[in-house]
């Protein structure tokens, strides 16, 4: 059995769709994102056994030059046979070629197989996140609350202490966990994902599938915190209504009871499984197999 890896080609579409259907029971989104993935920096990789596609994975270069490892899928007939390792080797060949200082991925807190594969290549557990969601139809947009203006990175930087405490150093959009930094906030500003004023910050956006969900982070400063968070949530509800997003999704540190309680009071529902972000960084990497 010969395992090889190469860049995705348009003629691989049907095979990759079958790989996704076999590898995961739900949340099939390859068809929606393949064109987007091919337009972003970083390779969409196909793994083949004896020339036949049986796995795939995407490496994406983010705003700060780090890489995000996503869409790792292996057909069940070929799992635990070295296909995932081959995709990771391809990832790290590209990481070295691009000179990227860090690589990250996420998995479910109980997904030992995914975490174990990442650990073989030097990724280490970095942070854990709890998520909650609410259908847009359950949101209420109040007309008596003043909307938030769009802001730039400079204004958002004032909220760094609160964001670090709330997010563990990462901002989540479409289950992509961006390292919290000035460079990342400038990238978010360029995407139009930042809203706020001197007391309230809302980060809201979607990398892809904007009709599926709008991903948000909320932060506040000073007194009347619940009032400020309510203003941010109201603005997010309006954005979701305008974009046609089916739901709002929020990720935060599992120990942040303030955000958790606020979301519960406003109709959000807990997701059953927390997410774990894993990271490889140049200065701490032990193996690049």
Predicted feature locations:
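Active-site rim helix/loop that mediates acceptor-substrate recognition in acyltransferases
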Residues: 13, 20-58, 165-194
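Conserved beta-strand in the GNAT
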Residues: 46, 52-60, 68, 73, ...
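Conserved catalytic-core motifs of GNAT/GCN5-like acyltransferases
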Residues: 61, 104-107, 124-138, 269-281
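A conserved beta-turn-beta hairpin within the catalytic core of GNAT-like acetyltransferases
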Residues: 61-69, 79, 206-218, 270-274
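Conserved acetyl-CoA-binding loop-helix of GNAT-fold acetyltransferases
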Residues: 74, 80-94, 116, 120, ...
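Conserved active-site alpha-helix within GNAT-family acetyltransferase domains
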Residues: 85, 109-127, 254-271
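Conserved GNAT acetyl-CoA-binding A-motif
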Residues: 94-110, 242-253
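Amide-forming acyltransferase catalytic core, primarily the GNAT-like/NAT-type
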Residues: 121-211
